[in-house]
Amino acid sequence: FAEFRLPGFDYPLRVLLTPYTNGQRAKRYMGTEDADEGLRVFLRDHWAGLADKYCDTEGGNLLVAHLFMAREGGELPEEPEDERPINIGGADVVYTSLIPPAMQYAALGHLHRWQTVDTEPCPAVYSGSPLSYSFSEAEQDKYVTLVDLEPGCPARVTKRRLTSGHPLARRRFEGVEVALQWLAEHPDTWVELTVATDTFLTAQEVKSLHAAHDGIVCIIPDVRDASLVNDRVASIHD
């Protein structure tokens, strides 16, 4: 728990802080094999105790947590491919119903896509990452969240789309020439490029693609003739 007095405000900001929890350490700490349920009970009681002691209606009350949180009985948020799964070998789902009623907003971390997982007892929001971390997040808009808190009032939540940084794109083209045209039109993009080809891409074709664009992360040839691929694999094994 932390309380802040900020210039220009005549009321304090109270923050309940919950970092990432390792499942094995949680088991040892709580002395239980059911770390998931044990963690949920522990967080419920711990949060409630702090909220009852410090979080009245005379200040702004905020929960900040690195947890896999969802509405009980609702659809689970999707974890990004490149993020360590927090609910496998770590802490499992923590339900939004455990958030103390005194909280006005829950700022959540771990998931990379902006999403609101619940609005009760307060908005529980993953603001997501400011930039895409992998091509599993290609074409995904990124946001920051602005939250206005006043004592005893619902939080006013505004999301702002980020426009800085290079976007990630996954693109497939029927041939090198079409790919070169698209690359010329999108210079400020990181690209995972798939090129359909009757045979394998030549060294000159690969060189021309890289020369046309500085943001190519990888080039994937999609060979139409499966027998060529099979022959290449057979020659490698031989």
Annotate each PLM feature.
Residues 56-57, 97-102, 119, 183-186, ...:
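Short, conserved loop/helix-junction motifs that constitute active-site signature segments
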Residues 61-62, 105, 123-125, 190, ...:
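Structural motif
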Residues 1-89:
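Conserved catalytic scaffold of divalent metal-dependent phosphoesterases
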Residues 2-13, 18, 122-190:
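Binuclear metal-dependent phosphoesterase catalytic core
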Residues 149-238:
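Accessory, non-catalytic peripheral segments of nucleic-acid enzymes
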Residues 21, 112, 199:
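Flexible, active-site-proximal loop/turn residues at the rims of small-molecule/cofactor binding pockets
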Residues 69-153:
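Conserved beta-sheet core of the metallophosphoesterase superfamily
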